[in-house]
Amino acid sequence: MALKTLPIEARPRERLLARGPSSLSDTELLAILLRTGIVGKGVMQMAQELLSPALPDPATGALRGGFGGIGGLLQADADALKRIKGLGPAKRTSLVAVLELARRMLAQTLPKRDLFHSPRAVRDYLQLHLGGKPHEVFSVLFLDSQNGLIAMEEMFRGTLSQASVYPREVVVRALHHHAAAVVLVHNHPSGQVQPSRADETLTRSLTDALRLVDVRVLDHIIVAPGSSLSMAEEGLI
């Protein structure tokens, strides 16, 4: 449905001005940012497509469709956005700029707080950094004794296994940062957040290695477009 066919008071922009942004859905807020659709695809339809689940192509394995929600969309880069018909350079640039602003905001605020007094902030931060990546990435959050963020480092990219992530490298980086604890994190581009046996085996291996240098593994978080899972909350750590 084209926005111009709606009564003026029902249009997203007018409703935002009258009632505030919290009264709008994710789709409506995104439609305001996109501004216009294309022939045969209204702006609301385009916004819905962007937020739809990402699905792997059966033939190539490449992701198609949307980005699985706001978290996945904000992680997408300009090239990934090209798979949505109707997103020209101007719209892609606007979306990527929003992503960068969100990243900078989180980078400024997250190190100033105790991460585990605000688990929502941790998940939002990880969703922005990993949620929409098309390939699997394993990273580590290095924390101080107050659970404040010292650094986040990517340790490996590709299919995750115990053989691909070397505990010694993680231990070396933890000692370099004088970390008291770490949070392990990796993404599942498929959209499924349930941990695999390889995830559980790797977590145990890293926990054992880091324990030898008095560094605690607080959690292993799995991130997918629009969702995440804490292995600690699931009783797997």
From Swiss-Prot:
One Gene Ontology term from the biological process aspect of the record: proteolysis
SUPFAM superfamilies: RuvA domain 2-like
Keywords annotated in UniProt: Hydrolase, Metal-binding, Metalloprotease, Protease, Zinc
Keyword set includes Protease: yes
Stretches assigned to the MPN domain: 115-237
Listed PROSITE patterns: MPN (PS50249), UPF0758 (PS01302)
Residues noted as binding Zn(2+) in the record, renumbered to the chain: H186, H188, D199
Family annotation (InterPro entries): MPN (IPR037518), RadC_JAB (IPR025657), RuvA_2-like (IPR010994), UPF0758 (IPR001405), UPF0758_CS (IPR020891), UPF0758_N (IPR046778)
The keyword Metal-binding is annotated on this UniProt entry: yes
JAMM motif (motif): residue ranges: 186-199
MF-aspect GO terms: metal ion binding; metallopeptidase activity
Similarity remark: Belongs to the UPF0758 family.
Name the UniProt record assigns to this protein: UPF0758 protein Aave_3773
Species in which this protein is naturally found: Paracidovorax citrulli (strain AAC00-1)
